[in-house]
From Swiss-Prot:
Swiss-Prot/TrEMBL keywords: Copper, Oxygen transport, Secreted, Transport
Name listed for the protein in its UniProt record: Hemocyanin A chain
GO biological process: oxygen transport
Gene Ontology molecular functions: oxygen carrier activity
General function of this protein: Hemocyanins are copper-containing oxygen carriers occurring freely dissolved in the hemolymph of many mollusks and arthropods.
Source organism superkingdom: Eukaryota
Location of the protein in the cell: Secreted, Extracellular space
Organism: Cherax destructor (Common yabby crayfish)
Length: 35
């Protein structure tokens, strides 16, 4: 129940979201490059 733990979870969630967006963009670039 430490506020720091909540902050770490939120930061991890943000990082996962950013990675997901990066992979999404890379996939779009790859598809466009192939097509």
């Amino acid at each position: 129940g430490v506020p720091g733990d909540v902050h770490d979870e939120q930061k991890q969630h943000d990082i996962n979201f950013l990675l997901f967006k990066v992979y999404e963009v890379l996939x779009d670039i790859x598809l466009k490059x192939v097509a």
